Amino acid sequence: MAIRCFGLMLALVRCLITLSIALLLQVGPAAAVLNSDSYDGNIYALYAGNGSLVPPASTLEESLAEGRTAVIVYYLDDSAVSKRFAPVVSELQRLWGRSIDLLPLSTDPLQGREALGAGDPATYWSGIIPQVVVIGTDGRVVFDQNGQVPLADINNAISTATGLPAPDLGRIDQEGSFNEVNIEVTAN
């Protein structure tokens, strides 16, 4: 009787293993989709090759207190327009480095709450993504635009805010994928 039970249990285990393997083989690979409003993860790591952008190294309040130029980029991880804009944000970090405080901020925590003053990112958010706000060393808004803002426009606004010459953009194609942008950046 015990041998018969053991044989049945062994057959059942084999059947379950076979079924599990069959189910695993039918699951498709995970894929990030640039042109969908699906959540794929950190958009800067996936679509700009730069996961170091979030969370930002400093806060808006710290930037204002230290008199540094702050560049706020409002985005959502589950937004196709934010995904397409991610390489521009990464390029800003490459161009300006430590000369500015680059603050890519998800708008999720800002939804439906009151702004708490100049040091609160909700103060400057218009409700549309992506949105780029450049705040000068004196705390004044120098630039505020929504949508697929041209890199050259942001670059010029940062130059005005910092008083530093704008870095040359070369021949970077803002509409390309991050791999194309990275290739063009390294080719210059």
Predicted segments with their positions:
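N-terminal secretory signal peptides that target proteins for export/translocation
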Residues: 1-10
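Bacterial N-terminal signal peptides
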Residues: 11-26
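N-terminal "domain-start" segment that seeds a small globular fold
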Residues: 29-59
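Short active-site neighborhood of thiol/selenol oxidoreductases, capturing the structured segment around
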Residues: 63-78
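Thioredoxin-like thiol-disulfide oxidoreductase module
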Residues: 90, 101-142, 151-153, 157-163
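Thiol-/selenol-based redox modules, centered on thioredoxin-like
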Residues: 147-188
